[in-house]
Amino acid sequence: KIYSRDRNLWHISHEGGALEDPANSPPEDVWMLTVSPEKAPDEPRILTLGFEAGVPVSVDGKKHSPEALVAKLNELGGFHGVGRVDICENRLVGMKSRGVYETPGGTIILEAVRTLRALTMDRDSARMCEKLMPDYADLVYTGRWFAPLREAMDAYFREATRFVTGDVRVKLYKGTATALGASSPYSLYSEDLATFGPSAKYDHADSKGFVRLYGLPGMVAAQVRSGKRAGKSVSKAASSGGGKTAKALLPSAKLAAAPIKTGKAAKKRAKQVLT
């Protein structure tokens, strides 16, 4: 069995041989970093991953260099079957390629940092991080590490994740990495605001006006498309003596009230309404 393998600190990829047919399951002898989830330990491993300004810096309270930290997580995750990925990807030259990857450390870090971002970042900044991630990955994948865009993205990530500092507990079990909880001195979570019970900081009655305004676009659209709002406009104009105004409004009101049709029937209906 012939496989093409590429390995770096972050992952190892496997292609070729039986993997060239997307219908084939990856043979067990493909994998090098991870054990089969079925053969992984029956007892989960719970670790604590520490972050400073969005960068993982420690495992279970012990500081590591970036390289040593990823290597440590690769070892722990691989032992528990974490980090297997089977994808059909799009190569830069246009063809599709099926490959399987092993990235235990990357899987653990991604699960943890997303959890910590949710706790410490405002909604818009966190969403922008998620939007930029695929583009950043494309730049790296296609060999454009030194592209100005990549440097600009790094500048955004550095600024946006300045307060992504804290600890995340992650459970490794049978091929999964699951965040169990997170804490941070910069947490934006307020129990007083989030509680479903009585709160001195948040009056649930305040939401009534917000709900009315938030639903206003949908309400107006529903009225217009059902003909109710247009009909009221015509009635109001007619009752106030504005004959010309009412006459001008009448065709659009009829169209709004008319059921939506297509083709010849639509043209015929429009002609009837406008004459």
Name these PLM-found stretches:
Residues K1-A238, K244, L250:
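Nucleotide-activated chemistry modules centered on ATP-dependent adenylation/adenylyltransferase
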Residues A230, V234-L274:
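Composition-driven recognition of long, low-complexity, acid-poor segments enriched in small hydrophobic
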